[in-house]
Swiss-Prot record:
DNA-binding region(s), chain positions: 63-86
Stored NCBIfam families: PRK13777.1
Keyword hit for Transcription regulation: yes
Quaternary assembly: Homodimer.
Keyword Heme: no
Protein name: HTH-type transcriptional regulator Hpr
Matches recorded under Pfam families: MarR
Bridged cysteine pairs (disulfide): none
Swiss-Prot/TrEMBL GO biological process terms: negative regulation of DNA-templated transcription; response to stress; sporulation resulting in formation of a cellular spore
InterPro entries in UniProt: HTH_MarR-typ, HTH_tscrpt_reg_Hpr, MarR/SlyA-like, Tscrpt_reg_MarR-type_CS, WH-like_DNA-bd_sf, WH_DNA-bd_sf
Gene field: hpr
Coiled coil: none
Span of domain HTH marR-type: 13-157
Functional summary from the UniProt entry: Negative regulator of protease production and sporulation.
Length: 185
């Protein structure tokens, strides 16, 4: 292989990317619904819960760290952290040796809320868990990344899998590569 040459085709890259995109969106829809239902009684949204959890597990963190680990924009992390501070769940601070960054720590009230949520977690209300349970029972462990398709099949049914596989087959059958570009046949 010459320097600068790719050891994959554009079509192969496109199919891989589309598969991951479609699986992720389907999985996220279930995760989001389950997560929202879990935290709704406590008047939290997903970002707020995630921030509380990160602050708890990191035993305090900068807004930048919250954004990074929470997979959110810094302004999102800051704004939702501010709302949590107003409700008494977080406190903001600056460090003597680092005045540039804003840090947050979970308060006792915030920790109590988070621990209550953890206590009240019910896996039977979690469609991703339930979708994976049959695999765990059979293999003795919960699925890893390779098993994502099987989880989605259990959540959304075979028709969903057939539809997304069909879309990938359509790319395979109806597109070709010309001058390192994917074009319709």
């Amino acid at each position: 292989m010459k320097s600068g040459e790719k050891d994959y085709s554009i079509k192969e890259a496109m199919i891989f990317s589309q598969r991951i995109a479609q699986l992720s969106k389907a999985l996220w829809k279930s995760v989001e619904k389950d997560w929202q239902q879990w935290i709704k009684p406590y008047d939290l949204n997903i970002n707020e819960h995630h921030i509380l959890s990160i602050a708890y597990h990191l035993e305090g963190a900068s807004i930048s760290e919250i954004a990074k680990f929470g997979v959110m924009h810094v302004s999102t992390a800051f704004n939702f952290s501010k709302k949590l501070e107003e409700r008494g769940y977080l406190v903001f601070s600056k460090k003597e040796d680092d005045k540039r960054n804003t840090y947050i720590e979970i308060t006792e009230k915030g920790e109590e809320l988070l621990l209550k949520l953890m206590e009240e977690y019910n896996p039977e209300n979690n469609s991703v868990f339930n979708g994976a349970l049959a695999l765990r029972n059979f293999y003795g462990k919960f699925p890893e990344n390779i098993e994502l398709i099987a989880i989605l099949r259990n959540i959304y049914g075979q028709d969903f899998i057939d539809i997304f596989e069909k879309s990938l087959e359509n790319i395979e059958e109806n597109f070709t590569e010309q001058e390192q570009k994917l074009v319709k046949k």
